[in-house]
C-alpha cells in the first residue's frame, strides 16, 4: 500500500520540473498571475462540484456497507458479482463519454448548439445500443455466472434485473451530467444531489428490508430518478434557449 501510494507522488515530483521549467515554462503557475476578481466565481463553482462529489460518494459507495450490515458479507459477494458483470457496460460507456465534457465546454463557448445537439443524439443512440447489449447480457447471465464462479454461488435473476436497471440509469444520467458540467450550469444537479443524498439511505434501507439485497439496488436506482428527469430537461431548455432562473445557474 505504501509503494502504491508513493508511486504517483514520485512521478509528479519528477515530471513537474521537466514540464514547467523545461518544456512548457510559459504554463508554470505563479502567484503574480493570480487575479482575485475571478475567485468568487471559481470558488463558487468549485464548491458546487465538491458537494456533488460528496453526494455521489454517499449514493454510490455505501451500497456494500448497507448490504453487509443488513444481510451479511455473503450478500455483498452476490451483489458485487452481479454488479461487476454489468459494470462492463458502465466502463465501455464511460470511455465513450469521457471526451464529452471538454468538447461540450468548447462548443458552448462558441455557441455551436447544432454540434452539441448532434453529439448528444449520437450519445443517446450509443446508450440505446448499450441497453440492447445489456438485455442480451441479462438473458445469458445465468450461464456466465456458472462459468465464472461455478454453481456454489447462486445469483438471483431478479438481482441481475435490478443491477441492469441501475447501470442503465447511471449511464443515462452520466451522459447528461457531462453536458451540464461542460456548460457549467450545476445548480439543478446540486439540488438533485442534495435531495437524493437525504432520501437515499431511508429508501434503500426500507427497500432492502422488504426485498433483500436487491432492494438496496432499487433504492440506488430511485435516487437517480431526479437526475434522469431534470438533467435532460435542462439540456432541452438550453437547446431552445429558454434557460431561466435556477436552470441557468
Identify the role of each PLM range:
Residues 48, 63-65, 77-93:
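Alpha-helical transmembrane segments of polytopic membrane transporters and translocases
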Residues 15-60, 103, 111-114, 238-249:
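Interhelical loop/hinge segments that connect adjacent transmembrane helices in multipass membrane
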Residues 39-43, 112-128, 135-140, 157-160:
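Interfacial transmembrane-helix starts/ends
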Residues 1-23, 199, 213-237:
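Hydrophobic alpha-helical transmembrane segments
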Residues 87-110, 179-182:
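Helix-loop junctions and terminal segments of transmembrane helices
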Residues 73-75, 113-114, 139-168:
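Interfacial segments at transmembrane-helix termini and the short loops linking adjacent helices
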Residues 165-195:
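Membrane-interface junctions at transmembrane-helix termini in multi-pass inner-membrane proteins
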Residues 5-12, 57, 84-87, 122, ...:
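Residue-level recognition of pore/gate-forming positions within transmembrane alpha-helices
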Amino acid at each position: 500500500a505504501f509503494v502504491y501510494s508513493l508511486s504517483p507522488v514520485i512521478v509528479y515530483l519528477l515530471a513537474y520540473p521537466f514540464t514547467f521549467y523545461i518544456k512548457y515554462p510559459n504554463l508554470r503557475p505563479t502567484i503574480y498571475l493570480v487575479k482575485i476578481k475571478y475567485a468568487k466565481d471559481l470558488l463558487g463553482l468549485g464548491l458546487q462540484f465538491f458537494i456533488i462529489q460528496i453526494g455521489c460518494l454517499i449514493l454510490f459507495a455505501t451500497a456494500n456497507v448497507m448490504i453487509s450490515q443488513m444481510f451479511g458479507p455473503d450478500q455483498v459477494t452476490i451483489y458485487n458479482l452481479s454488479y461487476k458483470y454489468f459494470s462492463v457496460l458502465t466502463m465501455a460507456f464511460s470511455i465513450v463519454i469521457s471526451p464529452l465534457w471538454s468538447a461540450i465546454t468548447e462548443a458552448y463557448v462558441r455557441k455551436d448548439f447544432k454540434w452539441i445537439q448532434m453529439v448528444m443524439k449520437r450519445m443517446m443512440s450509443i446508450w440505446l445500443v448499450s441497453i440492447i447489449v445489456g438485455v442480451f447480457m441479462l438473458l445469458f447471465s445465468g450461464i456466465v455466472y456458472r462459468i465464472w464462479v461455478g454453481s456454489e454461488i447462486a445469483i438471483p435473476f431478479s438481482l441481475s434485473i435490478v443491477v441492469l436497471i441501475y447501470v442503465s440509469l447511471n449511464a443515462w444520467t452520466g451522459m447528461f451530467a457531462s453536458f451540464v458540467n461542460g456548460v457549467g450550469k450545476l445548480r439543478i444537479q446540486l439540488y438533485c444531489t442534495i435531495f437524493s443524498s437525504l432520501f437515499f439511505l431511508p429508501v434503500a434501507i426500507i427497500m432492502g428490508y422488504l426485498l433483500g439485497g436487491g432492494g438496496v439496488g432499487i433504492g440506488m436506482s430511485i435516487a437517480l430518478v431526479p437526475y434522469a428527469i431534470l438533467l435532460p430537461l435542462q439540456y432541452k431548455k438550453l437547446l431552445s434557449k429558454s434557460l431561466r432562473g435556477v436552470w441557468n445557474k
